[in-house]
Amino acid sequence: RVQTDMNYELTDVMSEYRPEHERMLYSLGLAGSAFKKVYFDPNLDRQVALYIPAEDMVVPYGASNLETAERVTHIMRKTKNDVTKLQDAGFYRNVELGEPVTFTTDIEEQKAKESGFSITDDNRYTLYEVHADLILDEIDQPERERPRGMGLARGEDRKEGEALQIALPYVVTIEQGTGTVLAVRRNWNPDDPLKLKRQHFVHYVYVPGFGFYGLGLIHIIGGYARAGTSIIRQLVD
């Protein structure tokens, strides 16, 4: 029954699943890392699974994986109409953002140059969706209940009246142009006593690298290709 339901979801309901997965596989071999985000879209009223390029996922230096990273930022781009619909649905705060501000990265500009096209004005908002462990006293109780296994070390006493400061997982969405916070949400299951963060991202790696991101064909054979080109030019000269 579960298999039948999942097949129905992926083939009939989630129409974007196959093309997004194929885009991810193509990018994976070149870049070495690719991501997919699985979440509930209020505009579509269903689950979606979208491909995310490696350059749109930002993690702290030294992070080893998504599960243990203290902060993961997804750079999103949404049209004004999409943001308005999410505000109307109560997913984002109903605040005035003005007109979208064009924002491009060095990677996007270089990719456009290599592909032979120019970047025109992009009438979309750039949003930073930050999945991070935060201490928000305005939302959480000052004296939090300690999850199982998170007590004080042996021989360590907490001062009387001192609040227990434990960062908990949240999702904070920020509009890049104005710096406006659109949403702050808890990112753990209410029934989870450990308050572990819910995982919305899947990281695919082509060849494991020395850090968080994997190595692709560009990294593996790129150096040999440049060396071969240099040798040929020297022989011709």
Each language-model region and where it sits:
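Extended alpha-helical, oligomerization-prone segments that build pores/tubes and scaffolds
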Residues: 1-237
